[in-house]
């Protein structure tokens, strides 16, 4: 078979298959061109999910007629000259416009700033229809109609108009976050108008426009640098999470990317604080010398390659974990909204009490007085489990621990999480704060405290064990016993000493001392299930902290146990002193805060 040179039109159509996969790809390329031209206002209009119409208008520098003629030819660009080592623009390949023109009907009207007039060029299926002077405002208008009309086979692989429109919206959101100084407007017959006014240097304000006010209220600022690589941005508190990773945004030298290394680093940073199947919200911006970065990995320019990927990953993980630790026990502010909905969901519109309430009197109150709650120097850090030794475990009831007037030593204003006032259903602590109240899940909170103690002891190699007077025998399938014994040494590092006890049984002889009384049966069975997913001892060694979290869950104060007032206050104080105590080891919130203003809203007083 004879080798021959392909036609320019066919070459462009092949390139379009890599660069322009769908309408959103075309929108991305055109918006990048507008930003590279210095635009401060970009308007995008669509119809039919971008397949029928995609128009991008900007107020950038514009082009002369001679520039328009070159702009639709492959590898013609004003952005680079003779090297790929110092790319500082979003586009540089010179493929977008010729690729679009080869598979769609493309028209470009432009006028350079300062020029007396503009020009227009039209292309359809790779053929130039006309190039002529035209009236135009300074800037550029690129209009794409009938995308893929020249390659109808590609149309079969596109999604519904609604899905394609949503993909364009996502592209605009990413660009809007990356460039807060630019005004973006997205409109069309297939969508409601979306507008992001310019916010200048206030990046958090732009993120609030795109991600919602809740993100602004639950975001932690990041600013870290290592070996001339700088990381800035915002990350949500662990309890402010979503069911997918669509709200994770990454930018490298201002370029929106969907890089696996960065996304993996985000997951790693939140590994101990978010439940399985949930994803944090984060907006990260990495700035580094362009020479340390390869953006020419893929024609779509959505992937990048770092010269030192380990440095970048370490910077991201370290910065996020340090920021989370700095925030301490902070939890998501959205809990109050959920609580308000729960309180009000049972009332129909216009509901009113059938009769006025009787005046309050001490005799009418169901509360019974008790001694004031004070900590007396008691610390959960010193005795995380022993505080509950000897307490009874009554069945959960609706009645609460009664209330008395607080003493000066326990005034709510002195503590972020306030002073304990009651215990509900032997599981929830109600504390009064300076401006509202807090409801604490006692098991989840203590679980986190125990885990942090175990992790600290593990890192310092001082995790002591306690010998059981009578070994706990756990019956397991033989294969589970074999798996556990492979990792006996690693479990021993955590203070859990196990050995075989005949066929199908494991003997637990020592448990971590700080756990106090441990549910050894449940702990060993859960560890057996988890270890089944790991293959080597090194895999377990890397997951020792995860195992510690499992142990902490089984060694924490259980639901249904009544606490004394001083124990409740000691738990609150320890939460305030422990980083990450706003969520348990599974990522669920340990407390919900309700502001006084929220309570007043419930009673119509606002």
From Swiss-Prot:
For the keyword DNA damage, the answer is: yes
GO biological process assignments: mismatch repair
Show the InterPro entries listed in the entry.
Answer: DNA_mismatch_repair_CS, DNA_mismatch_repair_MutL, DNA_mismatch_S5_2-like, HATPase_C_sf, MutL/Mlh/PMS, MutL/Mlh/Pms-like, MutL_C, MutL_C_dimsub
Instruction: Spell out the SMART domains in the cross-references.
Output: DNA_mis_repair, MutL_C
Q: Its Gene Ontology molecular function terms? A: ATP binding; ATP hydrolysis activity; ATP-dependent DNA damage sensor activity; mismatched DNA binding
Q: Which Pfam families match?
A: DNA_mis_repair (PF01119), HATPase_c_3 (PF13589), MutL_C (PF08676)
Keywords per UniProt = DNA damage, DNA repair
Residue ranges of the region described as Disordered: 350-371
**Listed GO cellular component terms?**
mismatch repair complex
Keyword DNA repair in annotation: yes
To which protein family does this belong? Answer: Belongs to the DNA mismatch repair MutL/HexB family.
Q: What is the protein's known function? A: This protein is involved in the repair of mismatches in DNA. It is required for dam-dependent methyl-directed DNA mismatch repair. May act as a 'molecular matchmaker', a protein that promotes the formation of a stable complex between two or more DNA-binding proteins in an ATP-dependent manner without itself being part of a final effector complex.
What is the protein name stated in its UniProt record?
DNA mismatch repair protein MutL
Q: What is the gene called?
A: mutL
């Amino acid at each position: 078979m004879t080798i021959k040179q392909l036609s320019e039109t066919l070459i462009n159509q092949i390139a379009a298959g890599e660069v322009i996969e769908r309408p959103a790809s075309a929108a991305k390329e055109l918006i990048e061109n507008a930003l590279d031209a210095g635009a401060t206002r970009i308007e995008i209009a669509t119809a039919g999910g971008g397949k029928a119409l995609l128009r991008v208008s900007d107020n950038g520098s514009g082009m002369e007629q001679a520039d328009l003629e070159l702009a639709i030819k492959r590898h013609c660009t004003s952005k680079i000259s003779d090297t790929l080592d110092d790319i500082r623009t979003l586009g540089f390949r010179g493929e977008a416009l010729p690729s679009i023109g080869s598979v769609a009907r493309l028209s470009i009207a432009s006028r350079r700033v300062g020029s007396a007039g503009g020009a227009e060029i039209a292309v359809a299926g790779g053929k130039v229809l006309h190039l002529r002077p035209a009236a135009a405002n300074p800037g550029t208008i690129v209009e794409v109609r009938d995308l893929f009309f020249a390659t109808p086979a590609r149309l079969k692989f596109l999604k519904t108009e609604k899905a394609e429109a949503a993909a364009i919206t996502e592209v605009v959101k990413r660009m809007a976050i990356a460039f807060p100084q630019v005004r973006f407007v997205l409109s069309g017959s297939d969508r409601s108008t979306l507008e992001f006014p310019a916010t200048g240097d206030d990046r958090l304000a732009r993120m609030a426009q795109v991600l919602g006010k809740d993100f602004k209220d639950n975001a932690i600022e990041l600013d870290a640098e290592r070996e001339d690589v700088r990381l800035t941005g915002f990350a949500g508190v662990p309890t402010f999470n979503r069911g997918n990773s669509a709200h994770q945004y990454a930018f490298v030298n201002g370029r929106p990317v969907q890089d696996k290394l960065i996304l993996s680093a985000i997951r790693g940073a939140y590994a101990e604080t978010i439940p399985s199947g949930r994803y944090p919200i984060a907006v990260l911006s990495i700035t580094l010398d362009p020479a340390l970065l390869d953006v020419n990995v893929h024609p779509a320019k959505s992937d990048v390659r770092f010269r030192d990927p380990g440095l970048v990953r370490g910077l991201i993980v370290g910065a996020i974990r340090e920021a989370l630790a700095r925030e301490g026990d902070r939890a998501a502010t959205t809990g109050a909204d959920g609580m308000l909905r729960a309180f009000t969901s049972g009332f129909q519109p216009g509901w009113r009490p059938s009769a006025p309430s009787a005046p309050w009197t001490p005799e009418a109150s169901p509360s019974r007085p008790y001694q004031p709650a004070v900590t007396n120097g008691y610390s959960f850090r010193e005795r995380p489990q022993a505080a509950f030794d000897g307490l009874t475990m009554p069945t959960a009831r609706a009645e609460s621990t009664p209330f008395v007037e607080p003493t000066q030593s326990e005034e709510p204003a002195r503590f972020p999480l306030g002073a304990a006032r009651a215990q509900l259903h032997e599981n929830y602590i109600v504390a009064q704060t300076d401006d509202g109240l807090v409801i604490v899940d006692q098991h989840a909170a203590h679980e986190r405290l125990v885990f942090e103690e175990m992790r600290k002891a593990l890192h310092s190699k001082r995790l002591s064990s306690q010998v059981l007077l009578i070994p706990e025998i756990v019956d397991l399938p033989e294969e589970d016993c074999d798996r556990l014994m492979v990792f006996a040494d690693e479990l021993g590092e955590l203070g859990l000493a196990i050995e075989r006890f005949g066929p199908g049984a494991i003997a637990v002889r020592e448990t971590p001392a700080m756990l106090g009384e441990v549910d050894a049966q449940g702990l060993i069975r859960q560890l057996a299930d988890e270890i089944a997913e790991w293959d080597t001892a090194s895999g377990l060694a890397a997951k020792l902290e995860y195992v510690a979290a499992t142990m902490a869950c089984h060694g924490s104060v259980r639901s249904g146990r009544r606490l004394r007032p001083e124990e409740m206050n000691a738990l609150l104080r320890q939460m305030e002193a422990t980083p990450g105590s706003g969520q348990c080891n599974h990522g669920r919130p340990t407390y919900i805060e309700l502001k006084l203003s929220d309570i007043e809203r419930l009673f119509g007083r606002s």
